[in-house]
Amino acid sequence: MKTRRQMKIQEIINNQVIHTQEELAELLRKAGFDVTQATVSRDIKEMGLIKVPTSEDDYRYAVPGTAQPLSTPDRLKRRLRETVVTVNDSENLVVLRTIPGNAQALASLIDHSNWEEVIGTVAGDDTILLVVKPAGAVPSVRERIAKLMQ
């Protein structure tokens, strides 16, 4: 019974967007399985299912390795919104302060975004230094960051 139920869970996860354990439990009940949320929770853990982002504020269950990751622009937008505390500049530099532990991942996303004016980033634990060339492009870089954070 457990094996059949877990096969059905995998089938459901692969064919539908499931946001919560309760949604999954309801679909299993409709398919003839007598389950509780606790049973579904144990199955999810045993199967190693993960929650992956589907949009800015939404997640769904997925089998590891099958979910399409967010594109770099979407990931950058999300990271900027969720982790940036302040944005400052001086001369040809833009300095982003982040929640501790987030600077390196955000800097990598900025690097992979290939912003023409940003010739490099340096990141610590909670600070990112963006080197901008020419210096006159600093306002446009700040504006781009502000738009992405909206």
Curated annotation (Swiss-Prot):
Regulates arginine biosynthesis genes. Pfam families: Arg_repressor (PF01316), Arg_repressor_C (PF02863). Disulfide bonds: none annotated. It comes from the Bacteria. It is found in: Cytoplasm. Keywords: Amino-acid biosynthesis, Arginine biosynthesis, Cytoplasm, DNA-binding, Repressor, Transcription, Transcription regulation. The lineage of its organism: Bacteria, Bacillati, Bacillota, Clostridia, Eubacteriales. One of its GO terms (molecular function) is arginine binding. One of its GO terms (biological process) is L-arginine biosynthetic process. Pathway: Amino-acid biosynthesis; L-arginine biosynthesis [regulation]. Belongs to the ArgR family. GO terms for cellular component: cytoplasm. This is Arginine repressor.
